[in-house]
Amino acid sequence: MAAGGTGGLREEQRYGLSCGRLGQDNITVLHVKLTETAIRALETYQSHKNLIPFRPSIQFQGLHGLVKIPKNDPLNEVHNFNFYLSNVGKDNPQGSFDCIQQTFSSSGASQLNCLGFIQDKITVCATNDSYQMTRERMTQAEEESRNRSTKVIKPGGPYVGKRVQIRKAPQAVSDTVPERKRSTPMNPANTIRKTHSSSTISQRPYRDRVIHLLALKAYKKPELLARLQKDGVNQKDKNSLGAILQQVANLNSKDLSYTLKDYVFKELQRDWPGYSEIDRRSLESVLSRKLNPSQNAAGTSRSESPVCSSRDAVSSPQKRLLDSEFIDPLMNKKARISHLTNRVPPTLNGHLNPTSEKSAAGLPLPPAAAAIPTPPPLPSTYLPISHPPQIVNSNSNSPSTPEGRGTQDLPVDSFSQNDSIYEDQQDKYTSRTSLETLPPGSVLLKCPKPMEENHSMSHKKSKKKSKKHKEKDQIKKHDIETIEEKEEDLKREEEIAKLNNSSPNSSGGVKEDCTASMEPSAIELPDYLIKYIAIVSYEQRQNYKDDFNAEYDEYRALHARMETVARRFIKLDAQRKRLSPGSKEYQNVHEEVLQEYQKIKQSSPNYHEEKYRCEYLHNKLAHIKRLIGEFDQQQAESWS
């Protein structure tokens, strides 16, 4: 810790500020929060330090520690104050501090030096003296209040109150039932209904109460807390409000208000007991704006004819998030066909990979599925969750901050290691056209082949597969059986030979058309690549850090759930590979996969939304962390 100069800053006077390290790299700047007892002990020591042979000391033990301040009477005793260490950005994400030291030169000129960011805070714990002092103050306040309420008030006295009119009893009443004279009679049903509604809401989960309030309007944190307290809030729930807001809401840095995240709107209940009729109508309008646009877009696209051109590259950001190397077991039919027909193939010296060409050529497009708009190819800056970027390492003890002190790397997504686990089992439950499983890292053509070629090739493949169904399983004749590895290799070689013998005009047209659709003008960047650009100031760096902290906990929770689901199928896939196809053990594992799929489908109905949200947050946080690391590295180089 560094102590400032003895002088103070004067009004209407200019000071120079130095932001260099001045060769003092061993200085650690901390924000210290003292209790009144600790301040009084320090002041006593300062006034008698020439008479006290001992000096104050501070000891750190992890995130806790002890401060010892010698007493002046008796001299051999000390004050002991426990403290704990916390991160400033995590406790107060809306602001940060710089430590400024005022020094004086030999000529008497004042100079201000910036010693660095205050990233950690020491909070001294209260002692018995603090509690005793608080009790004494409360007793004194109660005594003053009691004296004030029993004192005889005289005209012109210090506690002159308002006059109270005493109603006189009516002398003559014509009506024999005086109760009828009551004005504005109250309906007891309304009172009972309000009381019942309030008690019902207070018993609901605290998170549900928060999201149903944020669904109607944006709230600042104090406003939201005051609104929640009207229906009753216990101390435990009050302390968890910050963590809940980080999970379900976005913070507006301009007015510090919170708005509900889009994916949470699906959890809202239209019959929430705390809503009035006006609130319910308002909720309906909000839900129609949030949930219906995607349905309208899907309905419009079904009526359009499929056209393979560069215009197909324009699509919504939500559909772009579907592109992932991990084939999960809960992918629905429309989304699967849409994103598999629009992946960009790997290129070798500017030419398409033959394997990818073959895979794309063999995709039959049903009328309904073919009309689904195609998402654009991902830009080079898009980072799939299966291949996370290498992020700047750091040496910190706080996992929630994206830079320097207090950083842990984002977890690598292990659930993407086996990209095509049980893709065919998934086809059985959705009755889709069979798509060959691609090896990890390979992707499909963005534009499909011309419809005539697609139709002819899909017709040939359907004949081969229909024979296979009759031989293997008459019961599941409409489903697609698992394609064995040897048969895949043989068919792949046959299709490659057909492609090589095809006319150069047709293949060139496809390549040329797909190349045109991949031009940069048709690529839509993720929103975080547009919002978060290179950092040029410390204020911008702090804003990025706050955004990182606001979504980090949500990402960790989603990542843990996705990884748990993926590990089940990876384990079963490893068992399947050790067994011979057609054996009883192989069939048992196959049935186990189908049962596991049904369990996940029932227990996690929002699995797809959570998975895409997890991928999006991973790429966004990695991008923010990289920008902060680059900025810190630039600052370190400028100081050296």
UniProtKB/Swiss-Prot annotation:
Location(s) in or outside the cell: Nucleus
Compositional bias annotation for Polar residues: 184-202, 291-318, 391-401
GO cellular component, one term: nucleoplasm
Ranges of Basic and acidic residues composition bias in the record: 471-490
Protein name as it appears in the record: RNA polymerase II elongation factor ELL2
Record family assignment: Belongs to the ELL/occludin family.
Biased composition (Basic residues): 457-470
Subunit structure: Component of the super elongation complex (SEC), at least composed of EAF1, EAF2, CDK9, MLLT3/AF9, AFF (AFF1 or AFF4), the P-TEFb complex and ELL (ELL, ELL2 or ELL3). Component of the little elongation complex (LEC), at least composed of ELL (ELL, ELL2 or ELL3), ZC3H8, ICE1 and ICE2. Interacts with AFF4; the interaction is direct and leads to stabilize ELL2 and prevent ELL2 ubiquitination. Interacts with EAF1 and EAF2.
Post-translational modification: Ubiquitinated by SIAH1, leading to its degradation by the proteasome. Interaction with AFF4 stabilizes ELL2 and prevents ELL2 ubiquitination.
Gene: ELL2
Residue ranges occupied by any OCEL domain in the UniProt entry: 526-636
Its biological purpose: Elongation factor component of the super elongation complex (SEC), a complex required to increase the catalytic rate of RNA polymerase II transcription by suppressing transient pausing by the polymerase at multiple sites along the DNA. Component of the little elongation complex (LEC), a complex required to regulate small nuclear RNA (snRNA) gene transcription by RNA polymerase II and III.
One protein family per Pfam: ELL
Major location (coarse): nucleus
Location of Phosphoserine modifications: S503, S580
Region described as Disordered: 172-202, 290-320, 343-490
Source lineage: Eukaryota, Metazoa, Chordata, Craniata, Vertebrata
GO biological process terms, semicolon-separated: positive regulation of transcription elongation by RNA polymerase II; snRNA transcription by RNA polymerase II; transcription elongation by RNA polymerase II
Compositionally biased region (Low complexity): 360-372
MF-aspect GO terms: cis-regulatory region sequence-specific DNA binding
Keywords: Nucleus, Phosphoprotein, Transcription, Transcription regulation, Ubl conjugation
